[in-house]
UniProtKB/Swiss-Prot annotation:
Official protein name in the record: Uncharacterized protein AF_2131
The keyword Cell cycle appears for this protein: no
Keyword field: Cell membrane, Membrane, Transmembrane, Transmembrane helix
Keyword Hydrolase assigned: no
Organism placement in taxonomy: Archaea, Methanobacteriati, Methanobacteriota, Archaeoglobi, Archaeoglobales
TM regions (residue ranges): 5-24, 34-56, 92-114, 124-146, 159-181, 196-218, 231-253, 263-285, 306-328
Length: 329
């Protein structure tokens, strides 16, 4: 099995590194640009190999031994790993995804613009644009996922870990946005005009998500019913600001107009979610009161949780789709 996974990993790298050469127009593929791009790819590959070697060495594993172990790891076995082994697997995943992505972007930027400085600035701009945008698009699903873990599954550890991850991602997004505003002035790079024109929304979006991550973490840790009620009200009101920032960030409306539009959109989505939840509960013979008692007594049936989560997730996803569709129409 590990040989098959290793082959897939090699093919992933080959595909990522060949993609820029196949997509950039032929007139831009000068010998000088190709030479610089190949040198960058060599540096990326050596850095990736060194990173993998070091994470295995810290765990007392040889490179071959570590690769075989991690490439034979199955999804079912992952849940049974110790915290140290899980940390190793996650870091390995970041490395084998991050380095090919970096190689693809750097190589593509060098071939496209022929400027090494711009090539290193492009990933900053790209992720400064994409991280806040994705966070705002996924935010209603994040609230739903957190609610599912915290209140229906009563899994406090998973809720706290997810909150920390969300806050860290938001901090990374904020740093990238600030770096892009300070360092990148060239309008040759894509997304520069969008970020500078809507800098307020790009700064507020990660700050907003840092606050939400901290709020969710406190909800996982607090034992006070009064605080939980207060936090829940704030959390479920937060998609309104999320939608408003998304609309302003995409440049369709001013922030004031976006708030009005978001109020309508969020209200419609929440009403649809409430109605869908009521229908699902009735189909399984529950009401809102009996579901609450069942959760408190830890006797909730698996199928109802499955349908509650995915029906509401579908409603949120469709709602987001229509928002973006309206903006780009």
């Amino acid at each position: 099995m590990w040989k098959r996974n290793l082959l897939l990993l090699i093919l992933l790298h080959i595909g990522a590194f060949l993609f820029p050469f196949l997509t950039v127009s032929k007139e831009k593929l000068t010998p000088e640009r190709i030479a610089v791009a190949l040198a960058l790819l060599a540096v990326v590959l050596m850095s990736e190999a060194l990173s993998i070697y070091l994470i295995f060495k810290r765990r007392g594993l040889r490179l071959r031994e570590g690769l075989i172990w991690i490439l034979e790891l199955k999804e079912i076995e992952y849940a049974k790993l110790s915290e140290e082994e899980r940390d190793l697997a996650v870091k390995f995943g970041y490395i084998i995804i991050g380095f090919p992505a970096a190689g693809l972007m750097l190589c593509g930027a060098v071939l496209e613009w022929g400027d090494l400085a711009l090539a290193f600035k492009f990933p900053i701009i790209f992720f400064a644009f994409i991280v806040p945008l994705l966070q705002l698009c996924l935010f209603p699903l994040v609230v739903l996922f957190y609610t599912y873990n915290r209140f229906l599954k009563n899994d406090l550890a998973a809720s706290a870990n997810f909150s920390v991850f969300w806050a860290k991602l938001s901090i990374a997004g904020l740093v990238l946005v600030l770096l892009s505003l300070m360092l990148v002035k060239s309008e040759v790079l894509p997304f520069v005009k969008t970020i500078t024109a809507h800098r307020t929304a790009f700064i507020l979006a990660p700050l907003f998500n840092i606050f939400v991550g901290a709020l969710q973490y406190l909800m996982a840790k607090t034992g006070s019913r009064e605080l939980m009620v207060t936090f829940s009200i704030v959390l479920f009101a937060s998609p309104l600001l999320s939608f408003a920032l998304l609309l302003e960030l995409l440049g369709a409306y001013s922030l004031q107009e976006s708030l009005k539009f978001a109020l309508i959109g969020v209200s419609v989505i929440f009403l649809a979610m409430f109605a869908a939840t009521w229908v699902v509960l009735r189909l399984f013979g529950y009401s809102f009161d009996t579901l609450q008692r069942a959760v408190e007594e830890a006797r909730v049936e698996g199928p109802i949780l499955f349908w509650l989560f995915w029906v509401n997730a579908a409603i949120v996803g469709i709602g987001i789709f229509f928002v973006i569709r309206i903006l780009t129409f």
